[in-house]
From Swiss-Prot:
Protein's name in the database: PqqA peptide cyclase
Family as reported in the entry's similarity comment: Belongs to the radical SAM superfamily. PqqE family.
Cofactor note text: Binds 1 [4Fe-4S] cluster. The cluster is coordinated with 3 cysteines and an exchangeable S-adenosyl-L-methionine.
UniProt record, GO biological process: pyrroloquinoline quinone biosynthetic process
EC number: 1.21.98.4
Subunit organization: Interacts with PqqD. The interaction is necessary for activity of PqqE.
Organism for this UniProt entry: Acinetobacter baumannii (strain SDF)
HAMAP family noted in UniProt: PqqE
Reactions accelerated catalytically: [PQQ precursor protein] + S-adenosyl-L-methionine = E-Y cross-linked-[PQQ precursor protein] + 5'-deoxyadenosine + L-methionine + H(+)
Gene Ontology MF term list: 4 iron, 4 sulfur cluster binding; cyclase activity; iron ion binding; oxidoreductase activity; S-adenosyl-L-methionine binding
């Protein structure tokens, strides 16, 4: 065991990149369409077995849309038998009462459903799918019926942030226990669409104020609903402790078996191992990919001598790569970073008007076009 390396307590199983929606802020890789060789049911069983033996306690099922996998109930049952706390992150598309019942029987602990907006028309436009809002709404009712905690997630951006009060009202109508109002994090398709998604600072201040007003109102009513407001680091002056540090507690397995220290790391010019070829233990403790940004030896001067390095762990490596071209550079979010001007530029661009029509939607046709053209901007196509 490598000295000083902790346990991979949190396993994220990205079961598939397939999805019924086309959200333009999806964090999946732009070239996801070329990654089709998904792990089999038995291969996922083996991943869960190894992770549990290593000390993992929480298992998240995500995608893409994990409900596309017809073996999801089997995977949940196996994870439950191993003693994992299991969480399903879903759009609600493909969910039915029968599947909710089967997932309950399999031992699933937690379901988180995402919405795009409180307004059905805007919700479906952002999802690139007709009747998505109607399906999500009905599934929320059923999730509550089967005694799951009602956890709702809204990715907040410039096109829905001004609905923040209506979003919260919708969540209360659905008897949500927890609501995550997460300002868009700019990875994958969201980074491609950043100019059209990043809210202005004025929008952000207003949304946070309204959220705080609702918190006070709910507290006065002794209402159990918890509102979580996640500010984008693009409006911070200090970087986030991304994943609580590279290779510290978080282990992601992509649909094709690639092992990653975070779900966005696939884009980095690093050769990450595959669970089909190496054990999880070897990957976690010995692989170059997982050791690359552990500790502080990799940090540039300025970061290495910073008193905050043990709190933010140097910030986000993927963000440094996307904005500067080098994952070893100081996170541009940091006000001390020599690359902070990239963040200031993004803030300035948020003041430019942008319509939904300018967004590039996440679907196979756009992904294939991007893959062929590499870094050439793709023509926006919305699948019918």
């Amino acid at each position: 065991m490598t000295e000083g390396v902790g346990l991979p307590l949190w396993l994220l199983a990205e079961l598939t990149y397939r999805c019924l929606l086309q959200c333009p802020y999806c964090s999946n890789p732009l070239d996801y369409a070329q990654h089709k060789n998904e792990l089999t049911t038995q291969e996922w069983f083996d991943v869960f077995d190894q992770a549990r033996q290593m000390g993992a306690v929480q298992l998240g099922f995500s995608g893409g849309e994990p409900l596309v996998r017809q073996d999801l109930e089997q995977l949940v049952a196996h994870a439950h038998q191993l003693g994992f706390y299991t969480n399903l992150v879903t759009s609600g598309m493909g969910l039915t009462e029968q599947r909710i019942s089967h997932l309950k029987q399999a031992g699933l602990d937690h379901i988180q459903i995402s919405f795009q907006a409180s307004d059905p028309v805007l919700n479906d436009a952002l999802a690139g799918s007709k009747h998505a809002f109607e399906q999500k709404y009905e599934m929320c009712r059923l999730v509550k019926k089967y005694d799951y905690p009602m956890v709702l997630n809204f990715v907040i951006h410039r096109h829905n942030i001004d609905q923040i009060d209506k979003i919260i009202e919708l969540c209360l109508e659905l008897n949500a226990d927890t609501v995550e109002l997460a300002i868009c994090q700019f990875y994958g398709w969201a980074f491609l669409n950043r100019q059209g998604l990043l809210p202005t600072q004025e929008q952000l201040i207003r949304a946070e104020r309204i959220t705080n007003e609702y918190r006070e109102k709910l507290k006065a009513q002794n209402h159990p609903c918890k509102l979580i407001f996640v500010v984008p680091d693009y409006y911070e002056e200090r970087p986030k402790a991304c994943m609580n540090g590279w290779g510290k507690i978080f282990f992601t397995v992509a649909p094709d078996g690639m092992a990653l220290p975070c779900h966005a790391a696939r884009q980095l010019p690093i050769s990450f191992p595959n669970v089909r070829e190496q054990s999880l233990s070897r990957i976690w403790y010995e692989s170059t990919g997982f050791n690359r940004f552990r500790g502080d030896a990799w940090m540039p001067e300025g970061c290495r001598s910073c008193p905050d390095k043990d709190r933010d762990f140097g910030g986000c490596r993927c963000q440094a790569y996307m904005l500067t071209g080098d994952a070893s550079n100081a996170d541009p979010v940091c006000g001390k970073s020599p690359y902070h001007q990239f963040i200031e530029q993004a803030r300035a661009e948020s003041e430019i008007d942008s319509s939904l029509e300018k967004l590039v939607f996440r679907n196979s046709r756009n992904s294939k076009q991007f893959t062929v053209q590499q870094n050439i901007p793709v023509q926006n196509i919305v699948d019918d």
